C-alpha cells in the first residue's frame, strides 16, 4: 500500500510539471502591441551644438597625441645593475634582497632608496624574491677560535643585517619551513631526553628551539649551498662569551680586531664594527622595544 502511494505521488508530481511546462513549450506566440504606432521622441539638437562637440573631441585627440609623443621621446630611467659597494672590512652584504640590485652606501641599514630607479635582475640564491644573509663563521677566519663555541645573534632582537624585508626565510616560523625527513644527525637519547646533535655532538639551538631538521638552518635556504652540520651553538639562555672565555692569554696576539674585556658578537668578523644598536644590546642588554 505504501509503495502504491509513493508511486502515485511521483506520477502526480511529474504530471504537474509536464502540464505547467507545456503552457510555454506548445503555446502559440501572442502579439499584444501589434498595430500600435511607433513612439516619436522630440529631439531638439541644433547643428551648432554638434559642431562644438566634434571640435572639442578633435582638440582632445590632438592633446592625447602630443602626450604620447612626449612619452616616447622621454629618456629612459638609468638601469643600476652593478651595485657599487663602499663597505670597509670583509662583511658579507646581501645586495638584491628583493631581486633589485641598487647602490650600497656606508649606512646600509638606514639608507632610504625610495624613488631611486632600479632594474629587476635575477640574483643567484634567491628564494621567493628574498635572498637570506650569508653568515660568516669566525672560526673559519681565525684558527684560534676553531674549538670555541660560538653564539648566533638573536634575529628577533637585532634583525637580519643586510636584508630590508620584514620576513626573511632564514628565520621562518616552523609551519612555513618545507617539510623534509632530513636530519642533522641521528637522535641521541641522554637521560631520557631526545634531541638532535650536530657532527661535533653539540646541541643546535635556534630561536630558542632545538633544531631537529636540516631545513631549519639558514644555509638550507640558500640555493646550491652545502647543508653543513657544524653551525656554532646558539643559546638564548646564556650571556654572550667574552674573549677570555674562548682562548687563553697566549693567543690574544692572534685575535686581530677583537677587543679585550668586551662581550662579543662572534658572527661579526674580526676588524668589522658591530652595529651600535647590536653592540649595546650585547654589552648592556639594551634593546629598542
Swiss-Prot record:
Induction remarks: Expressed in the early-late phase of the viral replicative cycle.
Domain of life of the native organism: Viruses
Places the protein is found: Virion
CC annotations in GO: viral capsid
Entry keywords, A to Z: Capsid protein, Disulfide bond, Late protein, Virion
Main subcellular location of this protein, as a coarse class: virion
Region called Hydrophobic, residue ranges: 1-21
Domain-level remarks: The hydrophobic region might anchor the protein in the underlying inner membrane.
Role noted for this protein: One of the minor capsid proteins that constitute a network internal to the major capsid proteins and outside the lipid membrane. The minor capsid proteins glue and stabilize the capsomers.
Subunit structure: Interacts with the major capsid protein.
Protein name: Minor capsid protein P10
Organism of this sequence: Paramecium bursaria Chlorella virus 1 (PBCV-1)
